[in-house]
UniProtKB/Swiss-Prot annotation:
It is found in: Nucleus. Keywords: Coiled coil, Nucleus, Repressor, RNA-binding, Transcription, Transcription regulation. The keyword Repressor applies. One of its GO terms (molecular function) is RNA binding. Residues 80-90, 98-122 have a biased composition (Acidic residues). This is SAFB-like transcription modulator. SUPFAM superfamilies: RNA-binding domain, RBD, SAP domain. Its main location: nucleus. The keyword Repressor applies. GO terms for cellular component: nucleus.
């Protein structure tokens, strides 16, 4: 290292590499653990505290080292790329082979997987520990050679940088160690000094170099498959082959501590033997080193060519590095203290998560001590399934501290187990040359039979190297066997026939693993577990068919057999427990599913019941609503009916009231009409009591009128009709205009009963004067009203006639009275209750006036007054009976026919002659007086009296009366015997009434 030049450079802090950062931190006695960012921040803080500029840092750089490192890095990258491509192709082919061969049942697969994982862990651990040995040898060489301390520290820093950069992933994160810097002369000089201490084992350096080269390829997961396919017998040194035992002990920590103690004592015993043996052969080793110095250079060149044709171009640097590291480790392995120290500084970490990095382990274990190296390995067949870590601490105290603090703790969500790796890297066992050749031949044959297409160039180059290494190893083995007869006899007794013993071992245990100092990883190792064929040939199958070569093989095989038996039982129990737990989990899951399903069904049923209940409630509410609506409609209907009934009741009451008022009104009108008719009758009677005027009617031409008009007539028979007025009293008091047939029969009876007293008026009446039959006070009822003067020519004529006929007999008045009987019939039959008939006519006034009535004008004046009074009310009485006209001429004729009962009379003839009087007159027109006179002013219209009375009289008249129809000019035969006397008044004839005499 003295020849190397050192220069000073100025760089920025961000441009520094990890190795530069660690160098600066070590120079300042600071912690170098952590990733690049942590180191940069730590260095920046230190520079700022010193007052320096972080952007301008002075670095002491070796001029040769960067070039060498960059060259080596380039070679490694190229090797990685080429090797990775080859490994990817091989992996794809092996995956297809696995899929085609995977036909075993599930339990077999589980067992095979467990066994293969154990094998893979052991193979991986072999590779990992080989690299750890390199670190240890570098450290020991650093302690022995202080002048190379700085270079070794730089290499360690560069190694950490590569771990941080290329990284710590889920795959095996093994980084090959950087080469030592320096030229070839310095390397040769150092090599000579190192080889003086190793006399016997110089011949094995070639094998070690090849082993390291293959191991680097395996750990980088790049060209291991190429080396595997060549059928090369890859041999691993004793320090590497002794570690699968410890790895298996670490992977099976449950196997017990007794086996580990036996193995540890066995390793210690072998260490002592090897240490003594190493001291004995130092001198011979120095001489042999001088002789083989030139041969080593040739071998170096040959190794470079083989590595370039076989796997990659990094074989040159790795072989040189391996030689130096192995020579340093061989020199250090002479002492027991260093061996025991290195064996106890390694920690095995299991249970890591797939995303754990080596930097995480380094940071975690760095809290409890100084970490020399930290690596993460994984199962290459199933990346990410299981990850393990290997941590090398600086001292045993740090190891104990880490175990006590970190065992059974959690990292990245996974529980990790930290255990001490118990191994002996200085243990070496020697095997004979025949065993090597046999193992190599068998291995190559098996590789050819199983592999198919192999790389012939790689095979040939590796075979040449194997032959040279085996020849040299055979020579050195001969020397070693001469010096140590004890070991030779032991090995001879242990292995009397290597080929036969190997065959027996394969027959007894076809899948058994044959551990030893020179571990031969056979391909049939896949059959280790329970005799099943291998499922997949992974990249760790490359070292399987190797012959075991160590002196205590039988003892260790017995130990392995016992261990395998225990492991099988435990694995069986473990599988039974796992199966029971799996069944319990399945049962719990099924129960949970069933409970959840039943709960869901119950909830569904509950929801269904609730839905049905809500639906029923809704239906019930709808039904109740409809019922309420129906009841409301019924109530409204009943209310309408009630209101209709009330309305009808009110209407009925109103109609009854109207009817009652109408009846009262009609009764009042009837009463008024009755009074008027009574008054008219009285006036007519008063007028008839005077001299009857000359009748100018056309009936004068008839022979009836030409008879003697002064015929002697009985006064009683003359005035017997006066009794007819008595029937008018109270005749219409109980009349109802709605029932016109009510008095059809009863009226006759009542009138008959009222007139019984007038049947025989008595003899006293016959001698009385005529005017005494009249009531002399009938004109006094209207005296209070002023008399209206009248200029009626007929009255004048009447007075003149009466004056001329002073001595006219009373028969004339009788005749006139008979005429007026029809008038009384037409005027109305209502009797005035105020007028008393009968014997009131026989008052003294009438007797006093009986002699002088013709010559006086008082009576005519009274009649004029009475007539004047009647002119006031023609309209009122005419409105009450609008349909009662046209019958004035009906009742007049029988008054004349009663005089001659044997004569047929033309009824209505006079009515036909007096038709022009019908619109204005009721009674007076019958007399045939002048038409159009003023008398119709004071008479009620013909529609009142005559029509009304005709209707009232039409029902009960059976003899000589006509029907109520206004049939004028009707000719009726009236037989003489059909009408009695006294019927001329227009009323029915009464039984027992005396016939009128003329």
């Amino acid at each position: 290292m003295a020849s190397s030049d050192t220069t000073t450079e100025r760089k920025k802090l961000a441009d520094l590499r990890v190795i530069d950062l660690k160098t600066e931190l070590k120079r300042r006695s600071l912690d170098v653990n952590g990733v690049k960012n942590v180191l940069m921040s730590r260095l920046k803080q230190a520079i700022e505290e010193e007052g320096g500029d972080p952007d301008n840092i002075e670095l002491t750089v070796n001029s040769d080292t960067p070039k060498k490192n960059s060259k080596n890095k380039g070679r490694k990258v190229e090797a990685d790329e080429s090797g990775c491509e080859a490994s990817v192709e091989e992996d794809s082919g092996k995956d297809n082979e696995l899929e085609s061969q995977d036909v075993s049942d599930q339990d077999g697969n589980d067992e095979l997987k467990d066994s293969e994982e154990n094998e893979e862990e052991s193979a991986t651990f072999v590779n990992v520990l080989s690299t750890e040995e390199e670190n240890e040898t570098k450290q020991t060489s650093h302690f022995d050679n202080p002048e190379r301390g700085s270079d070794i520290q730089a290499e360690e820093a560069e190694e950490d940088e590569k771990k941080d950069v290329t990284g710590s992933g889920d795959v095996t994160q093994e980084i090959s160690k950087p080469l030592h810097s320096g030229d070839n002369e310095s390397e040769l000089r150092i090599k000579e000094e190192m080889e003086t201490s190793t006399s016997l084992k110089e011949a094995e350096d070639d094998n070690v170099s090849v082993t390291i080269q293959a191991e680097d390829a395996i750990t980088l997961d790049c060209d291991g498959d190429d080396l595997l396919e060549t059928g090369k017998n890859v041999k691993i040194a004793d320090s590497e082959t002794s570690k699968p035992k410890d790895e298996q002990e670490a992977s099976y920590p449950k196997d017990g501590l007794e086996d580990q103690k036996d193995l540890t004592s066995e390793n210690q015993k072998d260490d002592k033997e090897e240490s003594g043996k190493g001291d004995a052969v130092k001198k011979d080793g120095r001489e042999a080193s001088k002789k083989t110095e030139s041969g080593d250079k040739d071998k170096d060149s040959q190794k470079k060519g083989a590595s370039s044709t076989g796997a990659s171009g990094q074989a040159k640097s790795s072989s040189k590095d391996a030689k130096e590291s192995k020579s340093a480790s061989k020199e250090d392995k002479g002492s027991t203290s260093s061996t025991s120290g290195s064996s106890t500084r390694n920690l095995w970490v299991s249970g890591l998560s797939s995303n754990t990095k080596a930097a995480d382990l380094k940071n975690l274990f760095g809290k409890y001590g100084k970490v020399l190296s930290a690596k993460v390995v994984t199962n290459a067949r199933s990346p990410g399934a299981k990850c393990y870590g290997i941590v090398t601490m600086s001292s045993s105290a740090d190891v104990a501290r880490c175990i006590s603090h970190l065992h059974r703790t959690e990292l990245h969500g996974q529980q990790i187990s930290v255990e001490k790796v118990k191994n002996d890297p200085s243990k070496r066992d020697i095997k004979k040359d025949g065993d090597e050749k046999l193992g190599s031949g068998r291995t190559s044959g098996e590789r050819k039979s199983s592999g198919g297409d192999k790389n012939s160039k790689t095979q040939s180059s590796v075979k040449k190297d194997d032959r040279r290494s085996s020849d040299k190893a055979e020579k050195k083995d001969g020397k070693e066997l001469k010096k140590d007869s004890k070991e030779k006899s032991e090995s001879a007794t242990t292995v009397p026939s290597p080929e036969s013993s190997k065959k027996n071992e394969e027959r007894k245990k076809p899948g058994g693993k044959s551990p030893g100092p020179m571990v031969v990883i056979d391909q049939t190792k896949g059959d280790q577990v329970y005799g099943r064929p291998p499922i997949r040939r992974g990249r760790f199958d490359k070292m399987r068919n190797r012959e075991p070569f160590f002196q205590n093989k039988m003892k260790f095989r017995e130990f392995r057999d016992r261990k395998d038996i225990l492991t099988f039982e435990k694995m069986k129990q473990q599988r039974i427990r796992e199966k029971v737990e799996r069944m319990e989990r399945i049962q719990r899951f099924r129960r949970a599913v069933e409970m959840r399903r039943s709960r869901e069904m119950a909830e569904r049923e509950c929801r269904e019941r609730e839905r049905i209940r809500i639906m029923r409630e809704r239906e019930e509410l709808d039904r109740l609503q409809r019922e309420r609506e129906r009841l409301e409609i019924e109530r409204q209907k009943l209310e309408r009916e009630r209101m209709e009934r009330e309305r009808l009741e009110r209407e009925r009451i109103r109609i009854e009231q109207e009817r009652r008022r109408e009846a009262e009104r009609i009764a009042r009108e009837r009463e008024e009409l009755r009074r008027q008719q009574e008054q008219l009758r009285f006036e007519q009677e008063k007028r008839n009591s005077l001299k009857r005027p000359r009748d100018v009617d056309h009936r004068r031409d008839e022979p009836f009128w030409n008879e003697n008009k002064k015929m002697a007539v009985d006064t009683d028979s003359r005035f017997s009709h006066g009794s007819d007025f008595n029937r008018q009293q109270n005749r219409f008091n109980d009349f109802d205009h709605r029932d016109r047939n009510r008095y059809s029969e009863g009226s006759n009876v009542s009138s008959f009963e009222r007139r019984d007293r007038f049947v025989s008026p008595g003899e006293g009446k016959k001698g009385r004067p005529t005017m005494e039959n009249f009531n002399k006070n009938f004109t006094d009822s209207r005296r209070n009203e002023p008399a209206q003067p009248r200029n009626d020519p007929r009255d004048t004529d009447r007075r003149e006639v009466r004056d001329q006929d002073d001595r006219r007999p009373v028969g004339i008045e009788r005749t006139g009275g008979n005429r007026n009987d029809g008038a009384s019939h037409d005027r109305g039959r209502l009797g005035n209750p105020e007028i008393q008939h009968g014997r009131q006519r026989d008052s003294g006034n009438n007797q006093a006036r009986s002699g002088t009535w013709k010559g006086e004008g008082g009576i005519s004046a009274d009649k004029r007054e009475a007539r004047g009074e009647r002119t006031d009310r023609p309209t009122r009485e005419s409105t009450g009976q609008p349909s009662r006209g046209g019958h004035a001429s009906r009742g007049g004729k029988p008054g004349y026919t009663s005089r001659d009962g044997d004569r047929s009379v033309i009824v209505g003839e006079r009515g036909s002659s007096g038709q022009h009087f019908n619109e204005g007159r009721q009674v007076v027109e019958r007399h045939g007086r002048d038409a159009g006179g003023p008398r119709k002013d004071w008479h009620a219209p013909s529609s009142q009296g005559s029509g009304y009375n005709a209707r009232r009289m039409s029902d009960g008249r059976s003899g000589g009366m006509m029907s109520s129809n206004p049939a004028i000019n009707r000719v009726v035969q009236m037989p003489g015997g059909s009408m009695q006397r006294g019927s001329g008044s227009g009323f029915k004839s009464y039984k027992g009434a005396p016939q009128r005499r003329y």
